[in-house]
């Protein structure tokens, strides 16, 4: 199961900002860009040595840019300690950047050789270092590099990517063409969005970070993107006052569960309870009342009528609508009534499909689309959504207001004017029915506990993914059910509790 270390930063920089900031930082600290390249190469070399101490023949793939310059430094350091190194370099009519040219010269002066990229690879190669393409890539790699990438991916040796796996777009996490499937990735100066969302989860392997000694400069900079992970839950979820009562923790109304979908509304209701909601009322089809009360007697379950809905809206602190709502007249009428609710609300599932038909803008609303729902909301294809998840989350906010949670690997949370978070928890076990219903209940509960809509969305996504990570660490990802999260969710939303049986290898709160 992929899990990023807690030591990596929680600030994330746009790729263009890093490239500009690198020069500013070097000037501010009296460093040259070549000195930063030497530090990057040293950091990458140390990751290679630490992760693969027995590797004795390294194949270093160097591109024709500063990422390739890092590769020359890695190769020279490896050769200096007696490791056999075969270095393949991409040819180009353009001159190398100054820093990369210096690194290349140092490699040659150390007795290194440079081979054409089309040579037959030695059979003894047991580690591949990817320094082909860096963070400036904005399109699919050209054919000659794609062939190298495919060759590396088909080779049995592990791959360490320098700064970013070649072919992965640093800004978006998209892969428009061939991409290195790295086992380890060492990135420098600051995290890039593309390392945390989209296809990054498939290709980065274990992520490492090195600031290259720029910490003092970085500390004085502001960034608009944040990485959110389980160790931050204690920031949002404080211990409760001993004298608090159920009314203090939110009255949540959940609306949905049309014919045949009682399970969706039941999962949302229980998730809200497990995430700490004081009182949860479910409005649903009359046929669902007995099964829901039998399954979870702590829920208050009523038939959805215009009268019960009107009374419940007056009672509620928060409304969650959508799980199992359907798109027939029953669900449409309920949604029309809820539209003008003035307190926090969350729309999911069929509420989003109906919203796509009749769009409106509400600043007190959290929407939680998966990529298919987001595509309908924005009138585009799923491929367009996945090609730039951060931008699409921001577009959702611009069009619909409030907070947008674009679900998927590396869930993105966006709010006006420029709040942007990437959720760095979760796993492939969550690709199963009902997970979105559970998330809706969790976020709804946190809204009821007086978190701001943006904080509730971020904390809810983290608690959701962290609960699944505990399960994955114990049992694996295959066969995980949405209701399995209830066994770990209570522990996760009480981060102040020390559980001696808690598996610290999981990606959950300490």
Regions found by a protein language model. Give the residues of each.
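Small-residue (G/A/S/T)-rich helix-start motifs and N-terminal tracts that mark the onset
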Residues: 1-89, 97, 184, 195-349, ...
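Short, conserved catalytic or adaptor-binding loops enriched in Gly and charged residues
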Residues: 104-109, 178-179, 199-202, 396
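Internal gly/pro-rich beta-alpha loop/helix module
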Residues: 126-127, 132-223
């Amino acid at each position: 199961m992929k899990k990023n270390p807690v030591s990596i930063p929680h600030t994330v920089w746009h790729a263009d900002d890093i490239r500009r900031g690198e020069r500013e930082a070097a000037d501010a600290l009296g460093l040259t860009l070549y000195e930063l390249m030497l530090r990057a190469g040293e950091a990458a070399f140390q990751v290679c040595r630490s992760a693969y101490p027995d590797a004795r023949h390294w194949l270093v793939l160097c591109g024709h840019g500063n990422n390739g310059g890092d590769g020359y430094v890695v190769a020279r350091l490896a050769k200096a300690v007696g490791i056999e190194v075969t270095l393949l370099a991409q040819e180009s009519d353009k001159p190398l950047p100054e820093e990369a040219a210096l690194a290349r010269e140092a490699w040659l002066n150390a007795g290194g050789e440079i081979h054409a990229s089309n040579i037959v690879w030695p059979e003894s190669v047991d580690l591949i270092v990817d320094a082909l393409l860096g963070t400036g890539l904005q399109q699919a790699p050209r054919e000659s590099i794609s062939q190298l990438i495919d060759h590396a991916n088909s080779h049995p040796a592990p791959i360490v990517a320098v700064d970013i796996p070649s072919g992965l777009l640093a800004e978006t996490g998209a892969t428009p063409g061939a991409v290195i499937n790295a086992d380890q990735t060492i990135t420098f100066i600051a995290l890039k969005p593309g390392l945390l969302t989209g296809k990054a989860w498939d290709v980065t392997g274990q992520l490492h970070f090195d600031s290259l000694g720029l910490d003092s400069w970085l500390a004085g900079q502001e960034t608009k993107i944040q990485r959110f992970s389980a160790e931050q839950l204690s920031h949002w979820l404080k211990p409760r006052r001993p004298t608090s009562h159920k009314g203090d923790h939110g009255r949540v109304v959940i609306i949905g569960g049309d014919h045949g979908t009682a399970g969706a509304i039941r999962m949302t209701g229980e998730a809200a309870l497990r995430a700490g909601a004081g009182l949860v009322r479910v409005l649903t089809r009359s046929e669902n009342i007995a099964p829901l009360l039998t399954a979870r007697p702590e829920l208050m379950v009523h038939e959805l009528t215009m009268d019960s809905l009107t009374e419940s809206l007056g009672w509620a602190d928060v409304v969650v609508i959508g799980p199992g709502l359907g798109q027939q007249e029953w669900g449409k009428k309920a949604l029309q009534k809820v539209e003008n609710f003035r307190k926090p609300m969350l729309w999911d599932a069929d509420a989003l499909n109906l919203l796509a038909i009749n769009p409106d803008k509400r600043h007190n609303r959290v929407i939680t689309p998966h990529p298919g729902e987001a595509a309908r909301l924005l009138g585009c294809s799923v491929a367009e959504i996945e090609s730039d998840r951060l931008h699409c989350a921001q577009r959702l906010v611009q069009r619909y207001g409030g907070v947008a949670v674009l679900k998927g690997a590396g869930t993105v949370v966006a709010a006006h004017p420029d709040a942007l978070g990437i959720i760095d928890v979760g796993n492939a076990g969550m690709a199963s029915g009902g997970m979105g219903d559970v998330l809706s209940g969790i976020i709804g509960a946190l809204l009821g506990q007086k978190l701001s809509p943006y904080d509730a969305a971020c904390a809810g996504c983290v608690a959701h993914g962290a609960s699944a990570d505990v399960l994955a660490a114990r049992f694996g990802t295959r066969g995980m059910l949405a209701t399995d999260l209830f066994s770990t969710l209570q522990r996760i939303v009480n981060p102040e509790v020390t559980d001696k049986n808690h598996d610290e290898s999981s990606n959950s709160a300490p």
